[in-house]
Structure formats: C-alpha cells, structure tokens
Amino acid sequence: MTISLAKGQKVDLTKTNPGLSKVVVGLGWDTNKYDGGHDFDLDSSVFLLDAAGKCASPNDFIFYNQLEGGNGSVVHSGDNLTGAGEGDDENVKVNLSAVPANIDKISFVITIHDAEARSQNFGQVSNAFVRIVNEETNEELIRYDLAEDFSIETAIIAGELYRHNGEWKFSAIGSGYQGGLARIATDYGLQVG
C-alpha cells in the first residue's frame, strides 16, 4: 500500500519494509501547453551528501552526464528529453545496503535545462512527483505529489532519503530555487563553472 506524503512529512522506509534494500526512485512531471517558445527539458539529478549536508567530491553528483555514484549504489536511468507520456520520466536505482557509510542523505532534484535562456520556470510545470518503488516487487511504497505553488523557480529539491538510527527514511521536501542546478550544486559544496 502506497503512503502518500505532503510537503514536510517524513516516513520510515526500511523500518516499515524489513529486508528492503533495492529501490527505484521515480520522478515525473508534465509541462503546461502554451503557444510558441521552446520545448521543455526537465532533468533529475541526485546529490550524495555527508553529515554536513555537502558532497565530498564531484563523484557524489549523479546526473545525465554522470549516471553512477556511491561506488555503484546509485544509478541514474539517463535523460528523458521530452517528459512525454505517463509514469516516471526519469528514475534512479538505489541499493540502500551498498550506499557508502559516509553518505548520510541522498537528495533528489528536478531542474529545467536552460531555464533562464528559454524563459521557463516551474510555474509552467504540473503534476510533478517523486515516488519510491521496491525494485524487486515493483510495489510503490511512497509517493509525494508536489503542490503546484511554484512560479519563478527553475529547480526543486523534491525529496531526500536519509539515514536515521541505522534505518533509511524519506522526507518530502518540495523546496523551489531560482538559479537552477548550479545554485543547488553550489549549496551542496560543489564548484560550478
């Protein structure tokens, strides 16, 4: 049975699902139809964070140009250029039992590629979600539908998996940012540019 979360809610993942080690984190979205302009290219990215909330190295940033991190414990499906169709637009496989011990938190981000140049923002995006699926059974465990209260933001931290007392939990974040992926990467301690 799927647990639906609202912004700010946290839920146990491994404690309530004993033996769970491999999950798929699916991210999805729709773009609002409007005349003219450029096509949207939304991207999901993953940041592997230490206890200080920072990436220890550029290898802790997983995205369409670096599909794997955490010694192979986190694998990105690759870039979906259109976001068309039903279901997940992009997904990330996480082997929770293999995530390196120095990683305390795994942050899942959705950004709009070239948002500023294309005059695009999350006010033009709807039905964004993040969900967690048991990779072995394909059962949806957790779903967080992001509210559509974004306007000028070009990046969203959708949610985070984090360690707590030896277990993994999920937090529905839903925080929007201006400045796109570069702003979030900088906040997470990476050099950009």
Curated annotation (Swiss-Prot):
Keyword rRNA-binding in record: no
Residue spans crossing the bilayer: none
Keyword Ion transport annotated: no
Induction of synthesis: By heat shock, salt stress, oxidative stress, glucose limitation and oxygen limitation.
Pfam families recorded: TerD
Keyword list, A-Z: Stress response
Disulfide cysteine pairs (residue numbers): none
Cross-referenced InterPro entries: Stress/Tellurium_Resist, TerD
Homology family: Belongs to the CAPAB/TerDEXZ family.
The name this protein goes by in its record: General stress protein 16U
Organism phylogeny: Bacteria, Bacillati, Bacillota, Bacilli, Bacillales
